[in-house]
Amino acid sequence: MTRVKRGKITCRTRKKRMQSVKGFRGAWSTLSRPAMQGSLRALNYSYKHRRKNVKTFRRLSIVRFNALIRNSGLPFTYNRLIALINLYNCRLNRNVLSQLGIRDSNTFTKLMKFYYH
């Protein structure tokens, strides 16, 4: 049986793995096996936290909405506002409305009063 030398492939794989764990501390940035574990862990956490970010920013936009509605003096809350917007088929999504409220609160208040009456 012929001899199979895998040095190049192994070196290439390890080099790629070590480049992906630059900045890690301890053995995770210097040794091959812990580096593999560390990179897999990092990829797993990055996936989880991307999903978590969506929930966090949604929660933030709801808090912003409630604050903006209270400041405008209208007698309803976030869930009532979303129900009215869906009722009138408003094409602006929650993120756009939240940014509108932050950047131009007068227009936001006029828009909410339009949907309220």
From Swiss-Prot:
The keyword Chloroplast applies. InterPro entries: Ribosomal_bL20 (IPR005813), Ribosomal_protein_bL20_C (IPR035566). CDD domains: Ribosomal_L20. One of its GO terms (cellular component) is ribosome. GO terms for biological process: ribosomal large subunit assembly; translation. Keywords: Chloroplast, Plastid, Ribonucleoprotein, Ribosomal protein, RNA-binding, rRNA-binding. The keyword Flavoprotein does not apply. It holds the Pfam family Ribosomal_L20. GO terms for molecular function: rRNA binding; structural constituent of ribosome. Binds directly to 23S ribosomal RNA and is necessary for the in vitro assembly process of the 50S ribosomal subunit. It is not involved in the protein synthesizing functions of that subunit. Belongs to the bacterial ribosomal protein bL20 family. NCBIfam families: rplT_bact. This is Large ribosomal subunit protein bL20c. The lineage of its organism: Eukaryota, Sar, Rhizaria, Cercozoa, Chlorarachniophyceae. The gene is rpl20.
